[in-house]
Structures are given as structure tokens and as C-alpha cells.
Amino acid sequence: MLILTRRVGETLMIGDLVTVTVLGVKGNQVRIGIDAPKDVAVHREEIYQRIQRGDEPVASGAHHNDDCSD
């Protein structure tokens, strides 16, 4: 596992097309933004596991808005 340190506002690249930006840190929560092509699915791990088990249908566009709550 690659471990990186980033500050709020800093970004890292995954390949040429995916960027991950640290948007904020509050207590033990880190808020990140992910910019990826529409054909790249992005999910929180627990959502991904539910999808793999067939517990949750994949909604169109859900890969860009898994958890937008504060």
C-alpha cells in the first residue's frame, strides 16, 4: 500500500485521468473529492460490497455522488 501525506487543497493523481483532492479535515474525518471519467465507478467500500452482493442496484450517476452529506 502506498501511503501519502496531503494537506487540504492538495491533490494526487491516479493514472492520467483520476484526481483525488483533500477538501477538508474535521476531527477524524477526511473529506475528499474525486474527479474521474464517467466510465470509472467510484464508491465507498461499504457501498461497493453491497453492490457486489447484489443488495443495491447501481443507479445511473451514483458513482459520482456516493456520499455528499456533511
UniProtKB/Swiss-Prot annotation:
What keywords does the record list, in alphabetical order? Activator, Cytoplasm, Repressor, RNA-binding, Translation regulation
Which SUPFAM superfamilies is this protein grouped with? CsrA-like (SSF117130)
Q: What is its main location?
A: cytoplasm
Single GO cellular component term = cytosol
* Compartments where located: Cytoplasm
UniProt xrefs under Pfam families: CsrA (PF02599)
NCBIfam families named in the record: csrA, PRK01712.1
Q: Into which family does the record put it?
A: Belongs to the CsrA/RsmA family.
Say what the protein does. A key translational regulator that binds mRNA to regulate translation initiation and/or mRNA stability. Mediates global changes in gene expression, shifting from rapid growth to stress survival by linking envelope stress, the stringent response and the catabolite repression systems. Usually binds in the 5'-UTR; binding at or near the Shine-Dalgarno sequence prevents ribosome-binding, repressing translation, binding elsewhere in the 5'-UTR can activate translation and/or stabilize the mRNA. Its function is antagonized by small RNA(s).
> Can you say what this protein is called?
Translational regulator CsrA
